[in-house]
C-alpha cells in the first residue's frame, strides 16, 4: 500500500522560539494586534510504501526520531492517509 504522511514538527513548549517572536513583532507592526503568540515549525509530506498502516506509522515514527526532528528541542506529530489508486 502507498501512504502519505503529513508531518508537523514544532519546538517544545519550554524552548524559546526567536523566529516566532520576530513574526509576532512583524504582525503587530502591520496592525494585527490580536495574535498573542506565534510558534514557527516545519511541515513535511513524505510518500511511502508499506505492507500495512501500522508498518507505515512505524516507518514515519522512525524517520522523525532519527532524522527529521531534533528530539532534544522539537516535538512532532503526523497524520497518515492511504493514497488511493497506487
Predicted features by range, described:
Residues 1-43, 47-86:
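Long, contiguous binding/interaction regions
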Amino acid at each position: 500500500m502507498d501512504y502519505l504522511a503529513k508531518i508537523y514538527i514544532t519546538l517544545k513548549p519550554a524552548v524559546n522560539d526567536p523566529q516566532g517572536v520576530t513574526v509576532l513583532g512583524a504582525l503587530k507592526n502591520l496592525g494585527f494586534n490580536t495574535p498573542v503568540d506565534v510558534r514557527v515549525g516545519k511541515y513535511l509530506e513524505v510518500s511511502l510504501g508499506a505492507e500495512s498502516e501500522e508498518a507505515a506509522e512505524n516507518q514515519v515514527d522512525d524517520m522523525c526520531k532519527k532524522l527529521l526532528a531534533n528530539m532534544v528541542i522539537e516535538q512532532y506529530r503526523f497524520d497518515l492517509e492511504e493514497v488511493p489508486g497506487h
